[in-house]
Amino acid sequence: MQSKEDFIEMRVPASAEYVSLIRLTLSGVFSRAGATYDDIEDAKIAVSEAVTNAVKHAYKEKNNVGIINIYFEILEDKIKIVISDKGDSFDYETTKSKIGPYDKDENIDFLREGGLGLFLIESLMDEVTVYKESGVTISMTKYIKKEQVRNNGERVEIS
């Protein structure tokens, strides 16, 4: 039986090659916690965006040499994911103010470039916090809706 709180930590080079490894690990963590398919897919997109931002921006002044830390904290009703780097920081509020709001009727060819990753992360996750001290740390939380099946008309939680 799974304990009420598990903690998994990864340290990977700041390279796009490792995004798929992180996504695969996330899928396993979320599946083990009983998350729905939609929650897993949302979290995979959000984490991919955060890691890709770290790969593209954090270490560009350091010849793209650096480490990205990823933490998964599995709690009773949610999974908290923290992604951090020690690279160059950015002004979150300034970046956020430039990305939206978007008009649903706006032609996609004319959307502003950049910042969509932050927009996606905030749209897909339940809680998002960005810290900028020595590098950038993005903390995101997804509340888990347990996968359920029907058994003779009754909903049964899969555990």
Swiss-Prot record:
Q: Name one Pfam family in it.
A: HATPase_c_2
Name the top EC class. transferase
According to the UniProt entry, what is the EC number of this protein? Answer: 2.7.11.1
Q: Which reaction does it catalyse?
A: L-seryl-[protein] + ATP = O-phospho-L-seryl-[protein] + ADP + H(+); L-threonyl-[protein] + ATP = O-phospho-L-threonyl-[protein] + ADP + H(+)
Q: Which InterPro entries match?
A: Anti-sigma-factor_SerPK (IPR050267), HATPase_C_sf (IPR036890), RsbW (IPR010193)
Entry keyword annotation includes Ligase: no
Q: Mind listing the GO molecular function terms for this protein?
A: ATP binding; protein serine kinase activity; protein serine/threonine kinase activity; sigma factor antagonist activity
Keyword terms, alphabetized:
ATP-binding, Kinase, Nucleotide-binding, Serine/threonine-protein kinase, Transferase
UniProt lists the family membership as follows: Belongs to the anti-sigma-factor family.
Q: Tell me, in a sentence or two, what this protein's role is.
A: Negative regulator of sigma-B activity. Phosphorylates and inactivates its specific antagonist protein, RsbV. Upon phosphorylation of RsbV, RsbW is released and binds to sigma-B, thereby blocking its ability to form an RNA polymerase holoenzyme (E-sigma-B).
- Report the NCBIfam families cross-referenced here: PRK04069.1, rsbW_low_gc
Q: What is this protein called?
A: Serine-protein kinase RsbW
Species of origin: Staphylococcus aureus (strain bovine RF122 / ET3-1)
Organismal lineage: Bacteria, Bacillati, Bacillota, Bacilli, Bacillales
Supply the gene name.
Answer: rsbW
